[in-house]
A protein has these predicted regions:
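C-terminal structural segment of proteins
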Residues: 1-174
Length: 174
C-alpha cells in the first residue's frame, strides 16, 4: 500500500487526499479502489454498515453509499504476497491501467483500475493465480476488450493487453 500511495497522481492529492475520499469518489483511474478489491476490503460506514469492496463500487464515480453516509474506516485482509503495477498517464500519473495482485491463503484476487468504467476483480486471472501463483499460469490468458475504456490515452485492446502484462509483472515482483 505504501508504494501504491507514493505513485498517486499529483502532490496535492498524494499529501492531502484520503483513502476514504478516493474510494468514495470512485474515479475509474484511481489507485486505492484496486487495492480495496485485491485486499478484500470491508468499508465501514457511520450507519454501521460493513460493505465488501466488491459490492461497494457500482460504476463510474458511483458507490453504494447512501445520502449522508460517510466512510469511517476500512479493514483490509493481509495477503501473503502482493504487488501493484500501473501504466501511468505521463501528465497526471493517474492509472491508464493499474493492477493490484494479492495472494491470500484463500486464493488470489486481481483488482484492476483504469481499464473499465469501474474498478473490478479480473476473475479469469484471479482464478488461474489461485490455482497456481505463477506468471506462467496466466501467460496464455486472453482478456476481452469488450467492456474496456477506449480514449486518447489507450484503446480498449491496448488496455486489455496491459491488464495481463501488468498482472504478470506484479506476480513476478512478488
Amino acid at each position: 500500500m505504501s508504494s501504491l500511495a507514493e505513485g498517486i497522481g499529483d502532490p496535492q492529492v498524494r499529501n492531502r487526499g484520503t483513502i476514504g475520499g478516493s474510494i468514495a469518489n470512485n474515479d475509474p483511474s484511481a489507485d486505492y479502489p484496486a487495492a480495496c478489491i485485491a485486499l478484500n476490503a470491508t468499508i465501514n460506514t457511520n450507519n454501521n454498515r460493513k460493505i465488501n469492496a466488491e459490492n461497494f463500487f457500482r460504476g463510474m464515480f458511483e458507490t453504494c453509499l447512501k445520502k449522508g453516509e460517510l466512510i469511517e474506516s476500512i479493514d483490509f485482509e493481509i495477503p501473503q504476497k502482493s504487488d501493484y503495477q500501473k501504466l501511468k498517464n505521463p501528465a497526471s500519473r493517474y492509472a491508464v491501467v493499474g493492477v493490484y495482485v494479492a495472494n491470500h491463503k484463500s486464493g488470489t484476487i486481481v483488482g484492476v483500475t483504469g481499464a473499465k468504467s469501474c474498478v473490478y476483480n479480473e476473475k479469469s486471472l484471479s482464478d488461474k493465480l489461485s490455482k497456481n501463483f505463477s506468471s506462467n499460469s496466466i501467460d496464455s490468458t486472453e482478456i476481452s476488450p469488450s467492456e474496456m475504456n477506449s480514449d486518447i490515452h489507450a484503446s480498449a485492446e491496448y488496455r486489455a493487453n496491459m491488464v495481463k502484462a501488468l498482472a504478470i509483472k506484479a506476480v513476478d515482483a512478488c
